Design a protein with these regions (language model features):
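Active-/binding-site microenvironments in catalytic and ligand-binding cores
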Residues: 1-118
Length: 118
């Protein structure tokens, strides 16, 4: 348990289903709100939660197992590395994964799990 912050990228995601939270998004948030506290929980608001219940809109496809056509926002490698440097405790996002839908390497998972970030 710790302090929580919300980084809102709904505007960027509205026009780009494959948008990824960037390091610039994080530093912009910090310019307005101050440094992300260590051991905090970072919540990323993409606006994708409004599509919950509609597989095609939420995932980009409604065909089970069709991973080639997944499209939803996530967190970039650079953003994950910056969050790890900030020593956050945990991360949450309103999409199906912290990696964006079209990922093939799941690098965001690798970076954050490697830093023991839940």
């Amino acid at each position: 348990v710790g302090p929580a912050i919300v980084i809102d990228i709904t505007q960027a995601c509205a026009g780009n289903a494959d948008y990824q939270l960037s390091a610039a998004d994080i530093t912009s948030w910090e310019t307005t709100h101050g440094a992300i506290p260590g051991e905090s929980i970072v919540l990323v608001r993409t606006g994708w939660g409004k599509f919950w219940g509609d597989k095609k809109k939420y995932l980009g496809t409604d065909t089970p197992g069709d991973t080639a056509n997944l499209h939803f926002p996530g967190i970039s490698r650079e953003a994950a590395e910056l969050l790890a440097q900030r020593k956050i405790e945990a991360i949450g996002i309103d999409t199906a994964s912290i990696d964006y839908g079209a990922t093939k390497d799941f690098i965001t998972h690798q970076v954050l799990n490697g830093a023991n970030i839940y």
